[in-house]
């Protein structure tokens, strides 16, 4: 199949370099659907790690070009598709960081990421499901920045599935925050699980906040500040401090402590809350994680278990209530 320069040659000269790259990427992403036998080449297991190394060295564009040339001849390498999808996801995030300017825009990068990640899922790459879900959460972020939290929440459509134990984590985190509360998430895994959990459990009236985005993304900060009823010019810690007298703040196990206002925090289920919480009617469940721990070799099972481990470091009651999960390998906080 054609290399990247030949794909790029179909773009008119007046088109910007960003759009030129977008056309090239779009042409590449059509390759798996062409089903041309001539496009099939041997899978090279070294290409995906080489691309990852380039990205770590700050050469993401070179990594994408490498993957593009390679996947044009070896479209059945699922790990290479995963890397390509991740890199387009990172490009979308950079678009936010750079003031929501430039071409392609963030949504187009997310479209590219979704297409590449769906190829990795087709080829049974475990992490494809996780990163495909993150793409949907990032699309939700663009929706929040465009129309606000309430409208974005109401307008969400059914998203591609994620592993049940990840969804279960999100539901447990949301159920750990009292109704009307503000849930501060930390890791991408937590943010993903909570985003999906809020779709499955819309009756849980909890507002998720990503403090890292609040600190760095002006559009996100403006929309979420208005939702919380605070001044958008305030830094995240002061903004949350203004919210605390009116709404319970809930800090997830991986939430950045630097973003938390100086309040008396107390453990409640999987989170720490800014004021005493009324016992919730819904019980937590870890059945999906227990099932995955027995049946799956995915590293994401361990990552999800790690969130529960970190929660136990703040709430020793979890050492007994999650005894079935911890089993013979309890987290350090639960060891004698």
PLM feature spans:
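Intrinsically disordered, low-complexity regions enriched in serine, threonine, proline
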Residues: 1-3, 17-18, 32, 291
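Bacterial N-terminal signal peptides that target proteins for export
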Residues: 4-23
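Bacterial N-terminal signal peptides
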Residues: 24-34
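Signal peptide processing junction and immediate N-terminal pro/mature segment
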Residues: 35-39
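ER/secretory pathway lumenal C-terminal domains and tails of membrane proteins involved
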Residues: 40-180, 192, 196-336
């Amino acid at each position: 199949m054609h290399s990247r320069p030949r794909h790029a040659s179909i773009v008119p000269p007046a088109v910007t370099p960003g759009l030129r790259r977008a056309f090239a990427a779009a042409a590449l992403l059509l390759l798996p659907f062409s089903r041309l036998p001539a496009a099939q080449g041997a899978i090279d297991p070294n290409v995906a790690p080489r691309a990852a190394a380039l990205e770590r060295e700050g050469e993401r564009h070179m990594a994408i070009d490498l993957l593009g040339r390679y996947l044009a001849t070896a479209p059945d390498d699922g790990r290479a598709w995963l890397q390509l999808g991740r890199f387009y996801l990172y490009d979308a995030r950079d678009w936010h960081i750079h003031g929501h300017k430039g071409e392609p825009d963030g949504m187009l990068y997310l479209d590219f990421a979704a297409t590449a990640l769906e190829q990795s899922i087709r080829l049974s790459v475990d992490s494809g499901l996780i990163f495909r879900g993150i793409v949907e959460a990032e699309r939700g972020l663009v929706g929040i920045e465009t129309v606000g939290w309430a409208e974005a929440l109401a307008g969400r459509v059914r998203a591609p599935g994620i592993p049940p134990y990840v969804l279960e984590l999100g539901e447990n985190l949301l159920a750990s925050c009292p109704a009307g509360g503000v849930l501060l998430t930390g890791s991408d895994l937590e943010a993903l699980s909570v985003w999906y959990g809020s779709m499955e459990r819309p009756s849980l009236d909890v507002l998720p906040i990503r403090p890292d985005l609040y600190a760095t993304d002006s559009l996100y900060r403006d929309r979420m500040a208005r939702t919380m009823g605070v001044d958008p010019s305030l830094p995240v810690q002061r903004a949350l401090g203004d919210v605390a007298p009116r709404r319970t703040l809930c800090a997830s196990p991986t939430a950045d402590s630097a973003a938390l206002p100086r309040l008396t925090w107390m453990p409640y289920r999987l989170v720490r809350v800014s004021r005493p919480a009324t016992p919730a009617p819904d019980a937590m469940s870890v059945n999906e994680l227990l099932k995955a721990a027995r049946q799956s070799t995915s590293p994401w099972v361990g990552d999800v278990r790690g969130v529960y481990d970190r929660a136990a470091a703040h709430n020793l009651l979890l050492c007994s209530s999650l005894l079935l999960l911890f089993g013979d390998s309890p987290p350090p906080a639960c060891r004698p």
